[in-house]
Amino acid sequence: MLRKAGLACTVCGSRNYTLNLSSVAKEKRVEVKKFCRTCGKHTLHKETR
């Protein structure tokens, strides 16, 4: 079973990406360094629910 999760920028707080994650692997939230269109640079994005 998959669950939808959004990725929010830690700098500006905008939600830029969505992921389909396995509901089994739910230990901790995902943190990925991705490009933020609002900030205009690569920043850390954390999972939101």
Swiss-Prot record:
What GO terms describe the biological role, i.e. biological process, of this protein? translation
Query: What Pfam families does the record point to?
Result: Ribosomal_L33 (PF00471)
GO CC annotations, alphabetized? cytoplasm; ribonucleoprotein complex; ribosome
Q: Name one GO molecular function term.
A: structural constituent of ribosome
Q: Which Gene3D superfamilies match?
A: Ribosomal protein L33 (2.20.28.120)
**Is Ribosomal protein found in the keyword set?**
yes
Keyword Cell membrane set for record: no
Among SUPFAM superfamilies, the record links this protein to: Zn-binding ribosomal proteins (SSF57829)
Keywords on record: Ribonucleoprotein, Ribosomal protein
Q: Which NCBIfam families match?
A: PRK00504.1, rpmG_bact
The record's listing under HAMAP family reads: Ribosomal_bL33
Q: Which family does it belong to?
A: Belongs to the bacterial ribosomal protein bL33 family.
Q: What is this protein called?
A: Large ribosomal subunit protein bL33C
